[in-house]
From Swiss-Prot:
This is Protein SCO2 homolog, mitochondrial. GO terms for biological process: eye development; intracellular copper ion homeostasis; mitochondrial cytochrome c oxidase assembly. Residues 91-279 are mitochondrial intermembrane. Keywords: Chaperone, Copper, Disulfide bond, Membrane, Metal-binding, Mitochondrion, Mitochondrion inner membrane, Transit peptide, Transmembrane, Transmembrane helix. Belongs to the SCO1/2 family. Copper metallochaperone essential for the synthesis and maturation of cytochrome c oxidase subunit II (MT-CO2/COX2) by facilitating the incorporation of copper into the Cu(A) site of MT-CO2/COX2. Could also act as a thiol-disulfide oxidoreductase to regulate the redox state of the cysteines in SCO1 during maturation of MT-CO2/COX2. It is found in: Mitochondrion inner membrane. The keyword Transcription does not apply. Pfam families: SCO1-SenC. Disulfide bonds join C145-C149. Cu cation binds at C145, C149, H236. It comes from Danio rerio (Zebrafish).
Amino acid sequence: MLRLRVFDRHKRLWSVLQSTIRGNNISNHIPNTTCRSSAPPHLCARQRAFYSQNSPKTPNPGSSAGIKLRTRLVVTLLFGGGIIGTWWYVHQEKEKRIQMQRLEQLRKVALGQGDFHLLDHTGQRRTKRDFLGHWVLLYFGFTHCPDICPDELEKLTSVVHILDKDPSLPSVQPLFITVDPERDDVSAMARYVKDFHPRLVGLTGSAEEVKQAGRDFRVYASNGPKDEDGDYIVDHSIVIYLVNPDGLFIDYYNRMKNDTQIAESIRNHMKTFVRLFPD
């Protein structure tokens, strides 16, 4: 009797188990490993936020960050432009001060600032004003000089040829003023200057006129004793003078300077020259 009761109980449990299995999908009892179905919603949200915060961002031009970037660039450009403008103004003012100081120094030296009235090798009366606006290379000598004067005039001619090869530079006017007016008349000067640069102008005059021209440039000249033929040598300064278009002496070159060095010096003067007395 007891066995029958136990058997009936087991039979009922088995029936309940079978009905439970048939009425439910077994897949509902298998755990899903994906975050979307099994993980708590707040955990997935945290993971999405984490990935979003660590991903690279590009500022949108219309965004607040883009506007700030453009503002910084504009401010930087304006600041840099202000610095450059200030530097340029200071530089220009410095150049003006240098020019004025140079003018004052030249006035104190008072070299070559006087006028001259001489005859050129064609017999025309010439003054210093005739050469204003031109760069002038000036040499004092005499036509009977055996070697030094021809050498210096050859060097002067070479300097002018070197500068003439650069079309960006203004032309230079070479001048030759005699220190021996007794022998160097107009015809003697005409014969002499033709052996040098074609633009070379020879200038002569009376003893007093020549002496005054030399005095303005502080030229030393002294006649030596005459020989039995009446010939003599003139001892004089051996200097090539550079005069700018304002008619002011600005540099000089002695015998130690060669043609290349002189040409380079003149080129530098030309590049930095600013008219002090504009027309």
